[in-house]
Design a protein with these regions (language model features):
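Short, well-ordered beta-strand segments in beta-rich or mixed alpha/beta enzyme
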Residues: 3-11, 39-73, 109-112
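A short, structured loop/turn motif at beta-sheet edges
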Residues: 15, 32, 60-63, 101
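Short amphipathic alpha-helical segments
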Residues: 15-41, 73, 81
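Compositionally biased, low-structure terminal segments
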Residues: 8, 12, 20, 27, ...
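Glycine-rich beta-strand-turn "strand-cap" elements at beta-sheet edges
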Residues: 36-54, 79-114
Length: 114
């Protein structure tokens, strides 16, 4: 059973440029450490304000979720970047979702660009 690990970070809008510059460094860190490549997004419309960043990745097991969080938590490079980013946070939290797979259900088809 697969799981989605998601970090949600609401940051001060006036610090967006500095926050995103640090986030780019986190993306580079993921590549260097060969960690799961997260997908970053921000709300365009919805409940969360636009000055919210979501990082998420899909992992095959709950153990893999725990291993990923543990690897990030004990990594000194990650800790250094996080210490620089925390002052911009208004709030941050972690979510874990179970991926639902219904037998016989077909995946959504992608629309072609015109």
């Amino acid at each position: 059973m697969a799981y989605v690990l998601r970090f949600v970070q609401r940051f001060r809008a006036e610090d967006e440029a500095a926050f995103m510059a640090l986030e780019a460094q986190f993306a580079a860190l993921e590549r260097r450490k060969r960690w799961p490549r997260g997908r970053r997004s921000r709300p365009f419309a919805g409940r969360e304000p636009v000055h919210t960043l979501m990082w998420e990745c899909e992992l095959p097991t709950l153990a893999a979720v725990n291993d990923t969080v543990a690897a990030m938590a004990k990594d000194p490079d990650h800790a250094r970047l996080l210490r620089r980013q925390i002052p911009f946070f208004l709030e941050a939290w972690t979510e874990v979702y179970e991926v639902l797979d219904f037998p016989g259900a077909r995946p959504a088809r992608r629309r072609r660009a015109s």
